[in-house]
Amino acid sequence: LKHERIDYRTGILSSPAEVPAAEWNALVARDARPTPFLRHEFLDALHVARCAVDATGWSPRFVTLTDERTGRLAAAAPVYLKTHSYGEYVFDWAWADAYQRNGVPYYPKLLCAVPFTPVQGTRVLAADDDARRRLAATLLALAEQSDVSSLHVLFPTETEAQLFDSMGMMLRQGVQFHWINDGYRHFDDFLGTLEQKKRKNIRAERRKVHDAGVTFRRLTGDAIRDADWRFFSRCYRQTYRDHYSSPYLNLEFFRTIGQTMPDNLLLVIAEAGGKPIASALAVYQRDAGGGGTLYGRYWGAVEHVPCLHFETAYYQLLEFCIEAGLDTFEGGAQGEHKLARGFLPTVTHSAHWLAHPAFSDAVSRFLERETNHIHAYVDELQDHNPFKRDAD
């Protein structure tokens, strides 16, 4: 049988609100393992709270394909016109510097990504493989026809990375640290799989926090009150202040996702002396067939207690994963310290196209060297695997 070619109408939208939420989320639901960050509610909250908008250097250019026959959304991607490289977690500052030194503008650039979110997941939502290929090709054509230096697709799935590779884009790899729930019944069950020294260190860290009189509340869904959001937002801002930088997100954003996607949120609040002193926010997704993934996202403290960061942002979340039957905990960007706590290295992907031929060649050679370095780095990390080999 000859397959009829479907005609699609391309849309370039300046706000997520221009896409019907139900149609967008229907594409998300088709994913084998959808992430909450691609949900319409999350992307719209970034826009409504003015975190990812023109004024912050994130001009939405959401790209959609609509089936001309049915009028239904067939594919969509979160795309932004960027005037800087903040909030991306795939670092191209050196590329931008090289452009500037040679008098060539690097910005604006096109970015297909979830703002401020280094989480691997589908970037081209689609009803089927044909629509996915067509939208991927549309992204590249848009970059080629626009006055931009480049197109970058951050943290796509491995399958998508291969698709972009087949279109001539350059692939880049990175490393994150993920924890796998090997059917643990409780936290001690997990500790029992670690080498003795690692196990001892974790117990010592937890004891320090306990002995300091710190207790914890784990809140999900509607149990998170506005006072909790206000305190968490204060902690979040403090983390950025401690690093002499400006926060990307704000209280309005956190309140908004608290209202629109409460079933995906876990807020941990640490308390001492009857008052809150630290907090961590995680996002999680239950899989239809059981299990699911928890994403550690933000943490902050207004008082210092030794090892409080590890307890609040790791051990409390690990316990939640075990109790809730979630099978993966993605710890986010960077952090070799996670290795000693049971998180193993995982390779992430990005895809890049540069319009300037000479720069494209130079970056291609750089990425070859960098990929070799990444592979050697992962091998080295695996040599320091914290789990028992055969016996303690």
Label for each model-derived stretch:
Residues L1-D392:
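N-acyltransferase acceptor-side catalytic subdomain
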